[in-house]
């Protein structure tokens, strides 16, 4: 994470857009057989990609969501690739840059597109009044919402499926099977759901007559009306009008036809065939060198084929081979796709029909059951290739053939990398730095008298009259492979101390370290990281007033923060009062999640949700806490929830009760703990367990280890008077801190519970409840917290009250 590459500095960038069937093969193979000097980056709108062959089985209820989706994050982690969770919206192939929806463009030396297809808009009302099957990565959720609507409606639901190809047939039968099963479970009559299938031509026109006849019989036996030779003219709310003029009542309309390519492919200037990227048999664009495409979004010149998953799967190996050849400067090889393929088409229940040439067999028979089992094994075997990764040992780095192909200037630059200087000789070059600063939209603040708009030896900042200056610093190495996201997290983390004090950050000085490498790669990495940081700074009204940059082994970023506040409004750790409510604004669990992510054990959706939380600034949260009279506050970071709560207890000469059952926890954190995965800082944090008065009672609770979990860019922990707590929590939730909740309470003592003076916290759960009684005060004793120099945690040299 944050390294150059596994085999030295980056020479060339290969970017894969989309996580389709072809690309998952390419991702794995570039991980199994690395090309030294090549950095592989996946740009994916969704971090979980569905396998189309198992989608009908999932709809029918035979597979879980996880069983039929490839999780792209563990796959990328295993292979050592970068993952950018965003959507491509254009390619500037002349300047070799990919334009993304929510962040700055990224460069490439070679790019491949495998993004599937999207619903067509040629039929009036289709986009507004139907549930589209394409793109398939979102259909599972759309189907579950549809199913919920049907099951909660007391009247009959009329479902119309539009599309008579194999996909529409499979989905119609799968949906009916699942819907009838769910109605039966709920004790409701089966006639609550009525199905029709509409197709412009005959049913399954590319399959043999015997297959069509078998499916017509199945439709008839299942009570599904089949409307052939009648296309859809318009779709409106509650009605599907056909080209014949017939109007079919439809409470739900499933659109499984007329899928189209994404418009930006043609808008980018690429050669297209009806909007699909036109590629030669090598899978390279016919007019843009270095641009490749595969799967449904591509059209191979001279080899037209149906839009089917089997062709995308088969394109994976030749695509991987030609991408390697292109990066090595070798001749590309033509690929001729197969003309026919064996279709194993499911019937909703666990039966299937085999369709090959003129051959057709199976159905609701023992043969059909056998074919289903065969299909099931084939599909699960394919999924297993991308869900279970082998252990790998990295080979010794060699002179990269990629560098040789790039020419003598690149080779000379690479030879200089091992002999990089220290001291000021380690600084990023002035020309690189100047270009990066020119590309950034640098935020300013009125209090900055001398900053980057008129650079000098130091920044000059005015402290407004009546205010005090608040200073803090944070720095750590990257724990994610995306410099843009890392820049956001790093600045949110650094500003957290300022917000926790109730101060307004006015300016920061950046300390940036980028991996050694060729000048273009160093520039781009520094730019992406600082673009992420300045995005957050602009959002919260804080200036980037200056900084320092250098080269090193890993990506790292920190900030010296200058803020201001009114002295009387400062929220100090020592400001708690007895009887106050403890409020936490963000969920915990980042330590175990990213420790698991490093091992390719964390699910992509867990990590994405965690990063969303970590990128959320606490500026608005701090304002709300001040408004509701919070007397004490801290940001929960490297020492974990317990460590920072103990700091507040010691500073306030109080004790606290912490409720495990009420802690907001990030999705997947408990699952990662069950795997025995914790942060490298966790053992040091656990040494503070002596501060827990009842640790022997509560340590068996599976949530208990999370109070020691080190957080990066964590939330605010604040003490608020009871009569203001509910209004404060509600305001925080409305401001976007959706998991905010009451997690405990402050006390002047822990009577009949604490047996040692350092026992400041009682941790309760459903089985162990604290009851306040007794007399006396808890004596404060300093508890030493040992630190370790790890990545995603608070800087070890941070001065605290510990």
Question: Over which residues does each language-model region extend?
Answer:
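A conserved FAD-binding loop/helix module that cradles the flavin
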Residues: 297-346
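FAD-binding core/adjacent interface of flavoenzyme oxidoreductases
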Residues: 2-11, 80-160, 187, 254
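FAD-site-proximal beta/loop scaffold in flavoenzymes
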Residues: 128-155, 238-241, 247-314
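A Rossmann-like FAD-binding core segment of flavoenzymes
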Residues: 83-90, 177-281, 331
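Helix-biased detector of long, well-ordered alpha-helical tracts
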Residues: 401-802
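Beta1-alpha1 glycine-rich phosphate/pyrophosphate-binding loop at the start
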Residues: 2-82, 120, 160, 166-209
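C-terminal auxiliary extensions adjacent to catalytic cores
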Residues: 10, 349-408
């Amino acid at each position: 994470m944050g390294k150059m590459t596994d085999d030295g500095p980056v020479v060339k960038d290969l970017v894969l857009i989309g996580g389709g069937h072809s690309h998952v093969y390419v991702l794995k193979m570039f991980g199994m057989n690395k090309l030294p000097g090549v950095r592989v980056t996946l740009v994916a709108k969704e971090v979980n990609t569905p396998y189309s062959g198992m989608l009908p089985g999932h709809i029918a209820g035979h597979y879980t969501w996880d069983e039929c989706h490839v999780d792209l994050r563990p796959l990328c982690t295993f292979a050592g690739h970068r993952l950018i969770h965003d959507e491509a919206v254009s390619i500037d192939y002349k300047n070799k840059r990919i334009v993304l929806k929510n962040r700055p463009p990224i460069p490439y030396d070679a790019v491949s597109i495998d993004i599937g297809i999207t619903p067509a808009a040629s039929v009036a009302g289709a986009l507004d009044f139907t549930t589209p099957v394409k793109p398939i990565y979102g259909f599972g959720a759309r189907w579950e919402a549809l199913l919920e609507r049907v099951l909660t409606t007391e009247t009959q639901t009329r479902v119309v499926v539009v599309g008579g190809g194999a996909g529409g047939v499979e989905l119609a039968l799968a949906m009916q099977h699942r819907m009838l099963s769910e109605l039966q479970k709920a004790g409701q009559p089966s006639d609550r759901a009525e199905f029709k299938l509409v197709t412009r031509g005959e049913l399954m026109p590319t399959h043999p007559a015997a297959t069509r006849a078998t499916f017509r019989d199945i439709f008839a036996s299942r009570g599904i009306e089949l409307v052939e030779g009648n296309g859809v003219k318009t779709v409106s709310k509650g009605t599907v009008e056909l080209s014949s003029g017939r109007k079919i009542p439809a409470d739900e309309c499933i659109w499984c036809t007329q899928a189209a390519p994404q418009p930006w492919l043609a808008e980018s200037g690429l050669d297209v065939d009806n909007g699909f990227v036109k590629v030669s048999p090598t899978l390279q664009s016919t007019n843009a060198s270095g641009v490749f495409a595969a799967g449904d979004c591509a059209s191979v010149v001279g080899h037209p084929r149906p839009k089917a998953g089997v062709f995308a799967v088969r394109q994976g190996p030749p695509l991987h081979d030609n991408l390697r050849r292109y990066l090595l400067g070798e001749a590309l090889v033509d690929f001729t796709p197969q003309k026919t393929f064996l279709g194993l088409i499911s019937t909703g229940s666990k039966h299937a029909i085999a369709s090959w040439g003129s051959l057709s067999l199976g159905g609701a028979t023992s043969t059909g059951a056998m074919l289903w089992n065969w299909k099931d094994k084939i599909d699960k075997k394919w999924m297993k290739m991308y869900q279970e990764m082998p252990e790998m040992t990295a080979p010794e780095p060699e002179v990269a053939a990629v560098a040789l192909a790039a020419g003598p200037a690149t080779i000379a630059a690479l030879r200089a990398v091992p002999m990089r200087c220290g001291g000021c000789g380690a600084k990023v070059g002035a020309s690189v730095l100047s270009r990066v600063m020119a590309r950034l939209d640098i935020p300013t603040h009125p209090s900055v008298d001398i900053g980057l708009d008129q650079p000098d030896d130091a920044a000059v900042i005015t402290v407004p009259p009546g205010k005090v200056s608040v200073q803090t610093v944070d720095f750590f190495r990257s724990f994610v492979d995306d410099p843009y996201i890392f820049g956001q997290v790093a600045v949110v983390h650094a500003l957290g101390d300022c917000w926790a004090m109730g101060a307004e950050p006015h300016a920061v000085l950046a300390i940036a370290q980028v991996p050694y490498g060729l000048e273009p790669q160093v520039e781009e990495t520094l730019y992406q990281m600082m673009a992420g940081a300045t995005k957050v700074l602009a959002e919260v009204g804080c200036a980037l007033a200056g900084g320092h940059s250098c080269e090193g082994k890993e990506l790292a970023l920190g900030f010296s923060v200058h803020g201001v506040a009114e002295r009387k409004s400062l929220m100090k750790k020592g400001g708690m009062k007895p009887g106050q409510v403890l409020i936490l604004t963000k969920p915990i669990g980042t330590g175990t999640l990213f420790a698991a992510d490093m091992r390719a054990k964390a699910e992509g959706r867990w990590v994405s949700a965690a990063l969303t939380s970590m990128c959320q600034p606490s500026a608005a949260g701090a304002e709300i806490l001040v408004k509701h009279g919070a007397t004490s506050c801290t940001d929960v970071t490297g020492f974990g929830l317990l460590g920072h709560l103990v700091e507040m207890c010691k500073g306030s000469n109080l004790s606290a009760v912490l409720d495990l059952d009420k802690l907001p926890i990030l999705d997947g954190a408990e699952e990662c703990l069950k795997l025995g995965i914790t942060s490298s800082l966790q053992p040091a944090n656990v040494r503070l367990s002596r501060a827990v008065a009842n640790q022997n009672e509560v340590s068996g609770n599976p949530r208990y280890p999370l109070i020691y979990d080190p957080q990066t860019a964590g939330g605010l922990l604040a003490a608020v008077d009871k009569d203001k707590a509910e209004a404060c929590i509600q305001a925080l939730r409305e401001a976007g801190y959706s998991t905010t909740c009451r997690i405990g309470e402050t006390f002047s003592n822990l009577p009949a519970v604490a047996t040692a003076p350092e026992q400041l916290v009682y941790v309760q759960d459903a089985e162990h409840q604290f009851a306040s009684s007794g007399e006396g005060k808890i004596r404060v004793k300093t508890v030493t917290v040992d630190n370790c120099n790890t990545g995603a945690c608070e800087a070890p040299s941070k001065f605290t009250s510990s």
